[in-house]
Amino acid sequence: MSSKNETTGSNRSKSSNEIFIGKKPLMTYVTATLVQLANEPSVVIKARGKSIPRAVDVAQIIVKRMDTLGYKVASVKLGSEAVKSQDGNTRNVSTIEVAVSRNST
């Protein structure tokens, strides 16, 4: 289930159904994801490096705590990106993409 992507952060483009996880409070991302899910059939939660546990938390809060809304984890993609650090070295940074969608039942 893991794949390796050799891209840099500058090549990424944001589509309307993607949520990028950063350093903001957890519930900020939960709210943003729920707003997107109201308009889209599925949303992809993306994170890199130290933000990966926060992305998993966001997905689990939506699926488990808000089970009355009927959302599920559709897929999980793991990978890595080659990123140039400030000192000029190339480092591999782990990535995760969690797709959350509505239950069809």
Predicted regions and their residues:
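Long, charged, low-complexity intrinsically disordered regions
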Residues: M1-S42, K50-T105
